[in-house]
């Protein structure tokens, strides 16, 4: 289980971006972090894996406080998939192998090789693509490679920062479906920052809304209603309703 308790964060010489944030996520849950631009969604993700130093609060993952752990220890437990795909001039297989780096001592082992092969197969990366260079494959395939790298880390917590923002609708569905299935299959915790509420309701079972640096709502996605969305998002809508779990926002 992940328990975030009274977490606050402010960049230097700025007001608090996150103020007393508390929420919990169980194994097997897929949590969507929602909110307006500047609400602190990506900042929260970076606090969870200590990219940003948290001065106040705790992040307890399976009874261990990540805030008190060293970076290399966190890397064994937490994987982050960002919206920007690394532009390294390496092969697909080598990119996925980087996911094992936190676990290795001096060299990669047969176990590392097995885990990497399994990760690529599970994500659906064809064997004839293993030797292809990252720069030569499509955006959708690149994002699958980054997911395979995260899976190769064998994480307890998978963080995703707008992982489908640069993809077309078809590839958005493919990637999020893969993530949803992996979270259930591996019984890990998944947290995604996402702007599209329809996608959040389709693939996630939990939601966390941030507004004015605080938690506005935390609960099941089924509890999301149109008034809540209107309150959180800075939109002027002539249509604002949920119908068959589809939210429509029309300017």
Residue ranges and their predicted role:
Residues 34-36:
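The feature captures the beta-strand-to-loop junction immediately N-terminal to the Walker
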Residues 49:
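Helix-to-loop junction immediately C-terminal to a conserved catalytic motif
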Residues 57-65, 74:
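Conserved ABC transporter NBD signature motif
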Residues 111-128:
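Conserved ABC ATPase "signature" region
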Residues 133-137, 141:
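Conserved ABC ATPase signature
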Residues 154:
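Conserved catalytic motifs of ABC-family nucleotide-binding domains
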Residues 158-162:
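Catalytic Walker B motif of ABC-type/P-loop ATPase nucleotide-binding domains
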């Amino acid at each position: 289980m992940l328990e975030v308790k009274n977490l606050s964060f402010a960049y230097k010489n700025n007001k608090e971006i996150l103020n007393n944030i508390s929420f919990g996520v169980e194994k097997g849950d897929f949590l969507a972090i929602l909110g307006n631009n500047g609400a602190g969604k990506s900042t929260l993700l970076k606090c969870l894996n200590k990219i940003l130093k948290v001065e106040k609060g705790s992040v307890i993952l399976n009874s261990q406080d990540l805030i008190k752990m060293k970076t290399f220890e966190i890397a064994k437990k937490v994987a982050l998939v960002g919206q920007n795909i690394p532009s390294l001039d390496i092969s697909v297989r080598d990119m996925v192998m980087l996911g094992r780096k936190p676990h290795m001592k001096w060299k990669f082992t047969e176990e590392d090789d097995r885990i990497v092969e399994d990760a690529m197969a599970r994500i659906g990366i064809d064997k004839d693509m293993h030797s292809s260079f990252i720069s030569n494959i499509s955006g959708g395939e690149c994002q699958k490679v980054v997911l395979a790298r995260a899976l190769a880390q064998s994480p307890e917590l998978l963080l995703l920062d707008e992982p489908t923002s640069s993809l077309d609708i078809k590839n958005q569905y493919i990637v999020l479906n893969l993530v949803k299935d992996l979270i259930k299959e591996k019984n890990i915790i998944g947290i995604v920052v996402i702007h599209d509420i329809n996608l959040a309701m389709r693939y996630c079972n939990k939601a966390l809304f941030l507004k004015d640096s605080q938690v506005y709502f935390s609960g099941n996605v089924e509890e999301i209603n149109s008034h809540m969305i209107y309150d959180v998002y800075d939109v002027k809508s002539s249509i604002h309703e949920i119908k068959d779990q589809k939210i429509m926002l029309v300017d």
